């Protein structure tokens, strides 16, 4: 302990900031110097989700440690609470943190079939916040306008709004917002049928939506986009700055793909028979990951045909086959009448994960290897033999057969190295 005590305060505070506040306070018994050091820790973490925990003791502990905090700036407050904590206590803690110049709030309210938590109005006029993360919170009673002049990161998970206008009022109060992560429930549980994201400064947007909703986007500075979920409609404006996108949706896709014409890295997992855009060319696309779980291979051929700079292609059964029958479109593939020029002149890397060696897969693998004249490396990783569904299991014997079949396939590139992962 003597050697640790010789370390400078700044270094010790960085270490203590990584610990839950309860553990930080326990260090005060180590020495006289440590007795007051915990009061300067700029990051505080509190958690009470155990139903059997002593609620009164926890409340007194949080009250005391927050009130005694002497950090010049309260960098972050992380609250993970259950419904045994009242809104009165929670509001008191948040108000104290705001008064201490709070920079980051991560509020996770664990509830089950109960009303989401309401937070004090003072939070929504906190001029020092740069990061705000809310889970299971109600914004019905928030009085607008609000002010988040320094907020750059906003996470909303299962948040309830007053009406469809509330989200845009909130976002318009964040003039320099760069990161927005939004998770919604099904239907109109959050009281917003059409969610509008109109943020000129936004650079990163992650959206997970349920069914029966609509997403409208106008984010011209966006560089990263991730869309997941099913049953919602998307209307997306032009994204001239987009660099990377993950699209895993079961909804109308032509508008989405059209807006991603400038993307450089793209992951696609689309429904069967998707709507494909007419005339869209992915001039900047260099890396494509294509999910093979439940989509038709015509989509892949479409992407190869319209991506003249594609250097890397990855195929991956991310979610597992949802249908196993001879009528499943995944079990049928017809060779196109013409070979995409991307295969002949550009593609350098091919990776296929969870390869099962199905007749259709073998035909597609043969087509890709045969016509990829610039291919440098092709990696095939057989599917896991521990699949719960018997019909999808790949035994050791099957893996050996698969690898032998792949090794015998002709390759259009003399430099192509075949790797079995």
UniProtKB/Swiss-Prot annotation:
Residues 332-382 form the FBD domain. Coiled coil: none annotated. Pfam families: F-box, FBD, LRR_At5g56370. Residues 1-52 form the F-box domain. SMART domains: FBD, FBOX. This is FBD-associated F-box protein At5g56370. The lineage of its organism: Eukaryota, Viridiplantae, Streptophyta, Embryophyta, Tracheophyta.
